[in-house]
Amino acid sequence: MHNFIYITAPSLEEAERIAKRLLEKKLAACVNIFPIKSFFWWEGKIEAATEFAMIVKTRSEKFAEVRDEVKAMHSYTTPCICAIPIERGLKEFLDWIDETVE
């Protein structure tokens, strides 16, 4: 099985640092990074922030390692690190993830 792991970070620099670490450790085949505007509840009030979202492409069994690695590097006390199962996909793409992630 395969996952997209959705992660948010407060800056492009932090997102890139996390992405590079996951790739260097072969925990991800690819990481997409894009800017987002987030609205959320925090400490009893609605907040808004510019953040950077990451989509990590990996194997399902790597979730715990990715989560632990990201949590150790992340500046947020409660970072968004959520796995989204890939139910179907192009076989060659999924094979590439399998071949790339160790």
From Swiss-Prot:
One of its GO terms (biological process) is response to metal ion. InterPro entries: CutA_tolerance, Ion_tolerance_CutA, N-reg_PII-like_a/b, N-reg_PII/ATP_PRibTrfase_C. One of its GO terms (molecular function) is copper ion binding. It comes from the Archaea. NCBIfam families: dival_cat_tol_CutA (NF041095). Involved in resistance toward heavy metals. Belongs to the CutA family. This is Divalent-cation tolerance protein CutA. The gene is cutA.
